[in-house]
Structures are given as structure tokens and as C-alpha cells.
Design a protein with these regions (language model features):
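N-terminal periplasmic/intermembrane-space "pro-region" immediately following the signal or transit peptide
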Residues: 24-99, 104-105, 117-125, 131-133, ...
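Residues that define the transmembrane beta-barrel architecture of outer-membrane proteins
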Residues: 84, 106-114, 161-167, 223-227, ...
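Membrane-embedded beta-strand positions of outer-membrane beta-barrel proteins
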Residues: 88-92, 128-132, 183-187, 231, ...
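Transmembrane beta-strands of outer-membrane beta-barrel pores
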Residues: 92-100, 134-140, 187-193, 235-237, ...
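Surface-exposed coil loops of outer-membrane beta-barrel proteins
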Residues: 95-101, 141-267
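Repeated loop/turn-to-beta-strand initiation elements of outer-membrane beta-barrel proteins
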Residues: 124-129, 177-183, 237-241, 272-278, ...
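Outer-membrane beta-barrel translocator/channel fold
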Residues: 139-146, 156-165, 280-298, 311-334, ...
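Outer-membrane beta-barrel "beta-signal"
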Residues: 379, 413-437
Length: 437
């Protein structure tokens, strides 16, 4: 039940409304009579008794989109206050993975991520957004990781993420009369830096694919970093972002570190079907000798979404580059897409990237330390088994053919490959809450 804290103010407001009504009646009388007529004195019996009528005060005519609020007796310049919204989502796999060759492995793992988002309006033009993202991969994947040849951070396996991947607080301020302009301030003990496209685990063009891209460290590897401060400005389809963050390795739970790295990102929505973007990051990363070195990341991407008859096609094309100190730059190229028609999905991914022998803990026969080009092609299929409200259950499988350079074949074989079978659970729900939480 709403509480009234300003009793005197309401009384004064009522008196003000009463005075306005009386003034309006006087002006109406002057319009009809030319001037106010002072009545002659009359005896009580000559003047019939009249009952006082309530004064009706019509609300003012407000501009479009600005409703009248009778409580405060004024037009609400920015519309009514929206309700708080709580959103939960989960994307969880149970995967059997097998890879071939001298480094081949087979294992069951459970990669996945869950996210909780809360939007609390502070005013009609100001919203606080809180995002918490976490995973159980430390338990469901473990230190060994998910088998995948040519992954470099956890060699030949996709590493598990930390329990807490994001704890972000955003203050979003609408500018101007409409919704075209926004200014956002970001504070995150753990969160995403403004680098690269949407991370692979959230990317629409990677829906259903349990594999991480081999080049994800060059393309979107800073989706969970420490001590992030940021600002973003959006004007219609154009968004410009800047973040400062720590290049220090993240650890549990989420200790804060010195902000020693920065990034900038620009995205442009061409229309409802095409989006392009580019980013640059200078990261001070710890090295093996106990010091730190600057790593410079440049990324560009194109994302598309199209409806074809009763099907959808979503695709991404990504280029990422990193240069460590004065070393030669390493490049990665990715093209991926998912085609969905009814309960069926077909997805694919092709990658070409440069990998050094040291990244894979290799010693080539010729002793070369130069980066070599590695290629990978993945094709997969996913079927929706259950779809009920916010809950969906899928079953799928994928096959990957890797193409190793000659120098890497003693350790990987002449035709390295991998396969996966999996179940996937997806949950997404949203609720608006009256009167807050």
C-alpha cells in the first residue's frame, strides 16, 4: 500500500487547486458579462437559498507520451515508471567427447552457463541493471577440460570457467525525448571488457554448438576479467564503448586488482539483419617469468540474421589478431552459422588460425618456433526433444575435421578429428515485479 509522506504539501496543493477553480469561474463570468457585476443588496427572503456545488477542475492537456498524474497534479514528462524485471537463463550441456591421434582423449563433461539479470527502474529515464553469471564447470568439467584438439589455453582441451563469470552493475540513463540515446556506466568486480563480438557461449550463430572456437582467445577472450570500469554511449544503431580493467588472472571469489588495461569497441547496426563491429585492447598480462607484457588485440566482425520461408539463418564472420610485445602478430579467422527449421538445427563452423609450437607444448623436428596455420571444420545437428514454456531439451552431435601442418603431424596424426554427442538443457524466464522486490 502506498504511503503518504507529504501531508502538508497535499493540503497546500488542494488549496491551490481550489483557488484555480475559483479563478476559472470568475474569468468565465467576465467573458459573459463583460465585467464583474457587483449585486445590489437584497434581503434574505428575496434571495433564494443555493446549494454550493463542487468545483470541477479538468486536467490539463498533456503533450503526446506525457500522461497526467493526478497525485502530483502535473504531466509526467518522461512517461510512467516501468516495473522491475527479473530474468533467468541457463544453457547446460552433458557432452561425450572423443578425439583421435596420439593426443586423443575421450571423456564426459558438462560445460554450461547460467545468468541472472535484474532491472530496477530508478526513474522513468534511469535504470539500474545487475547481471550475475556463473557456471559449475569447475565441478562438471574439471581441471582436465573438455577434449578438443588444438585448443591452446588448456592444451587440447577447452578449459573450465571460474564459478563466478560476471558480477556487473550498470546505470543506464536515457537521453533526449525518445529511446534512441543511452549513456551507460559500468562497475564490475568481475565482468566483460569491451572487446570482440558477443562471446561464443551467448552468440546466436553458435547456438547448439558445444565447442569453443579455437581462436576464441584472440576474438572474445575477455568476457570474464577482473575489476572492470566502463562507459558506453548509444545513439540509435551506433554504440561506442570504453572499458578499463585488470589483466591479472582471475581467481575465486573475485578480488579487485589495479586497472592496468583498456579497450574500446564500436558496433553499428546496419538494419534489422546486419551488424558490424570492431574493437582494440591493450592488455598487461602476466608472463611466465613473473613479470608482465603488453598484448595488443584487434578484432573485427560481421553478424547477420535472416528469415527464409519458415526457417532462420544466423551467421558470424570474425577476424582476431594479437601481438605480444615485439613478436609477430597471430591471426585467426572464423565463419559460423546455424540454420533452424522447426525442431531441427544444422550448424557449422570453419576456422583458420596461426598457432605457435610453444602454445601446444610441441618441439617440431626442425626446431622451428614460427607460427603455423591450423584449420578446423565442424558440422553438427541438433533436434528439439521437449519444448514446454521456458524449458527446452535438445539432443545433438557434431564432427570436427582438423587439418594440421606437417610440423605438427607427429603429435596429431595425418587426419586429426573429433566427435561429440550431447544433451542440452535451455531455460529462459522473465517476470515483471510490482512494487519492487
Amino acid at each position: 500500500m502506498p504511503r503518504l509522506h507529504n501531508g502538508p504539501a497535499l493540503v497546500i496543493g488542494f488549496m491551490f487547486l481550489f483557488a484555480q477553480g475559483a479563478s476559472a469561474q470568475a474569468q468565465q463570468s467576465m467573458k459573459h458579462g463583460g465585467s464583474m457585476q457587483v449585486p445590489q443588496s437584497a434581503s434574505p427572503k428575496d434571495t433564494p437559498a443555493k446549494t454550493a456545488l463542487p468545483i470541477a477542475v479538468s486536467p490539463p492537456v498533456c503533450p503526446a507520451g506525457q500522461p497526467f498524474d493526478p497525485v502530483v497534479n502535473m504531466c509526467m514528462a518522461h512517461g510512467t515508471m516501468p516495473m522491475p524485471v527479473l530474468t533467468f537463463s541457463l544453457n547446460q550441456f552433458a557432452v561425450y567427447s572423443t578425439t583421435s591421434g596420439p593426443r586423443g582423449q575421450s571423456r564426459v563433461t558438462g560445460p554450461g552457463v547460467g545468468m541472472l539479470m535484474y532491472n530496477q527502474p530508478l526513474s522513468p529515464k534511469n535504470t539500474l541493471r545487475v547481471k550475475i553469471m556463473g557456471t559449475a564447470e569447475q565441478l562438471t568439467v574439471g581441471d582436465k577440460g573438455t577434449p578438443q584438439l588444438f585448443q591452446t589455453e588448456n592444451i587440447d582441451n577447452m578449459h573450465p570457467h571460474d564459478y563466478l563469470m560476471a558480477l556487473e552493475f550498470r546505470d543506464v540513463i536515457k537521453l533526449g525525448a525518445g529511446d534512441d540515446q543511452e549513456l551507460t556506466f559500468l562497475l564490475a568486480p568481475r565482468g566483460a571488457a569491451a572487446t570482440g563480438p558477443v562471446p561464443f557461449m551467448h552468440r546466436a550463430s553458435a547456438e547448439g554448438n558445444p565447442d569453443a572456437p579455437l581462436g576464441h582467445n584472440l576474438q572474445d577472450g575477455f568476457h570474464d576479467v577482473s575489476t572492470v570500469l566502463g562507459i558506453a554511449y548509444r545513439n540509435s544503431g551506433t554504440t561506442v564503448e570504453a572499458t578499463g580493467f585488470s589483466g591479472h588472472a582471475i581467481s575465486w571469489p573475485f578480488p579487485l586488482h589495479k586497472v592496468d588495461s583498456y579497450s574500446v569497441r564500436v558496433t553499428q547496426k546496419i538494419d534489422d539483419h546486419v551488424l558490424i563491429g570492431a574493437s582494440y585492447a591493450d592488455v598487461l598480462s602476466p608472463d611466465d617469468a613473473g613479470g608482465a607484457e603488453h598484448e595488443k588485440f584487434v578484432t573485427g566482425w560481421l553478424a547477420t540474421t535472416h528469415t527464409l520461408d519458415r526457417a532462420t539463418l544466423k551467421s558470424s564472420f570474425i577476424w582476431g589478431q594479437v601481438r605480444v610485445g615485439h613478436d609477430p602478430a597471430l591471426n585467426s579467422f572464423l565463419a559460423e552459422a546455424v540454420y533452424q527449421r522447426g525442431m531441427n538445427k544444422l550448424y557449422g563452423r570453419g576456422e583458420i588460425l596461426q598457432i605457435t609450437p610453444s602454445q601446444l607444448d610441441l618441439v617440431p623436428p626442425d626446431g622451428s618456433t614460427d607460427a603455423k596455420w591450423v584449420k578446423a571444420l565442424t558440422l553438427g545437428y541438433e533436434r528439439t526433444l521437449v519444448e514446454k514454456g521456458p524449458f527446452s531439451l535438445f539432443f545433438g552431435g557434431s564432427f570436427t575435421r582438423d587439418f594440421a601442418p606437417v610440423e605438427f603431424r607427429p603429435d596429431y596424426g595425418s587426419a586429426p578429428r573429433g566427435a561429440k554427442l550431447y544433451f542440452r538443457i535451455k531455460v529462459g524466464s522473465s517476470s515483471a515485479m510490482r512494487d519492487g522486490m
